[in-house]
A protein has these predicted regions:
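Conserved acetyl-CoA-binding loop-helix of GNAT-fold acetyltransferases
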Residues: 46, 52-65, 84-92
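Acetyl-CoA-dependent GNAT
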Residues: 1-49, 60-62, 66, 70, ...
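Residues at secondary-structure transition points
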Residues: 32, 36, 54, 58, ...
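Beta-hairpin "wing" of winged helix-turn-helix
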Residues: 98-100
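C-terminal "cap" of GNAT-fold acetyltransferases
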Residues: 12-13, 73-76, 80-87, 93, ...
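Short coil/turn segments at alpha/beta junctions that flank glycine-rich nucleotide-binding fingerprints
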Residues: 53, 70-73
C-alpha cells in the first residue's frame, strides 16, 4: 500500500481528528486509460470508531475534486460483491456498476464489482 501512496501518480488523503490521530485515508492511482486520464480508488479506509460520521464521504469527494482538477475524467474502483454497505455508499456517491470481476480478491477467491463515475469537467 505504501508504494501506491508514495507514487507520483497518486492522490493520498488522510483524515485526522483534532488531536492528530488518523481517522481515515484514501489512495487514488492516476493513469491514462481508453477514455483519457482515469483515477482508480486503490483503497478507502476509515477507523471503525469514526464510521458513519461522514469521514469516507469527505475523503472521496475531496479525492474526486483533486482528481478532476488534474484532468481526470472518470473514477473507478472495485468492491467485494458481498459488501452491501460499501455498495450502497458508492452508489450514493454516484458510482454505477459496470460488471463483475471473478476472483478479484485472489487469496480469498472472492468476486468484485467494478464501479465507475464520470467526473464533471473543471
Amino acid at each position: 500500500m505504501q508504494e501506491f501512496a508514495e507514487a507520483r501518480n497518486a492522490i493520498c488523503l488522510i483524515a485526522e481528528r483534532g488531536g492528530g490521530g488518523i481517522t481515515g485515508f484514501v489512495i487514488v492511482h492516476l493513469d491514462f486509460g481508453t477514455t483519457g486520464l482515469q483515477g482508480y480508488v486503490v483503497t478507502l479506509d476509515v477507523a471503525e470508531t469514526y464510521r458513519r460520521e461522514g469521514v469516507a464521504s469527505r475523503l472521496m469527494l475531496e479525492a474526486e475534486s483533486r482528481a478532476g482538477a488534474m484532468g481526470v475524467q472518470q473514477m473507478a474502483l472495485h468492491v467485494f460483491t458481498g459488501n452491501e454497505g460499501a455498495i450502497r455508499f458508492y452508489e450514493r456517491l454516484g458510482y454505477s456498476r459496470h460488471g463483475v470481476r471473478r476472483r478479484f480478491y485472489r487469496v480469498a477467491g472472492l468476486d468484485a464489482f467494478l464501479y465507475r463515475k464520470e467526473l464533471a469537467a473543471f
